[in-house]
UniProtKB/Swiss-Prot annotation:
One of the protein's GO biological processes: translation
A single MF term (Gene Ontology): structural constituent of ribosome
Chain ranges passing through the membrane: none
Protein name: Small ribosomal subunit protein bS6
Function recorded in the entry: Binds together with bS18 to 16S ribosomal RNA.
Taxonomic classification: Bacteria, Pseudomonadati, Chlorobiota, Chlorobiia, Chlorobiales
Family: Belongs to the bacterial ribosomal protein bS6 family.
Highest taxon listed in the record's lineage: Bacteria
Key words, A-Z: Ribonucleoprotein, Ribosomal protein, RNA-binding, rRNA-binding
Gene, per the UniProt record: rpsF
Length: 132
């Protein structure tokens, strides 16, 4: 019996492509995941960013993060297809384990708490600047 596990795929698409080509490449990645038996849970579009170092002689990349459920044997098939896509500069698929999910929940909880403190500090700083 094949049980589905939770995975995440972070992909860097060539940043030099037009928006339509980037959207087509993203749609292709999603199609590959669903055709191979995966179920996409969420897609986080991080946009164009400068890479830390040149990848395939490119310094700009379009970052996308996809969470999906799939059976373990399907991952090798997905990677086999993605490996030969020229538009993808890099990709990484990892399994989301319970400790990693728990750590994410803690980070989200603390970022909400810290975010509200930082927002309060910035509004009080704005009020002081307007009095001058």
């Amino acid at each position: 019996m094949k049980t589905n596990k939770l995975y995440e795929c972070t992909a860097i698409i060539d940043g030099g492509l037009q928006d339509e080509a980037v959207a087509a490449t993203l749609a292709m990645v999603q199609r590959v995941i669903t055709e191979k038996g995966g179920t996409i849970n969420s897609v986080l579009d991080l946009g164009r960013r400068k890479t830390a170092y040149p990848i395939k002689k490119k310094s700009m990349g379009y970052y996308v993060h996809i969470e999906f459920n799939a059976a373990a044997p399907v991952i090798a098939e997905i990677e086999r297809v993605l490996r030969y896509e020229e538009e993808l500069l890099r990709y990484l698929i990892i399994q989301l384990t319970t400790p990693l999910l728990e750590m994410r929940k803690r980070v989200e909880k603390y970022s909400v708490v810290l975010g509200s403190v930082e927002e309060g500090a910035s509004t009080s700083g704005d009020a002081e600047g307007s009095n001058e």
